[in-house]
């Protein structure tokens, strides 16, 4: 999994998260999809704050955090959230486990930096995970429903990457991969083909299936 929030490993000086209504509202999604993603993000936000609270408890007792315990808690809580929207298949199970290890490891390494247990980080992670998981769910549902084509829909705003602007509007068979910069992706935020983190982090592009 790509370490999306620590790509540059720099100190965060301003908020990275965006209010959920704005973050998802600007995406080219149906109202139903937007509501699902807002709901997912709100639940995942609570999960992240719970995990940060566990770290705080360990710190208050001047104890070293139990890596395995916190990872297992995050895995279980993430699965509960995702399970409200889809069945947890092998792909999602593996992704959630790798994500959880990554988050806990990064938090332990950066306990002295307030950002890593902040509301902003919780929200930033939550909005990204809503898109990561539900983009995958949407792709699987499109295949099951017999869709055969897909089109990459980019944001076309000042935050958009040039590589995403370039692929925007591209239509290909549903089982083919988009060429995004130097990466191959089945859909936005997909890392199953080894896409670079720089093409995944905070991506708000979407896909239309036909």
Identify the residue ranges that each predicted region occupies.
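N-terminal leader/targeting and assembly helices and adjacent pre-domain segments
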Residues: 1-141, 145, 209-210
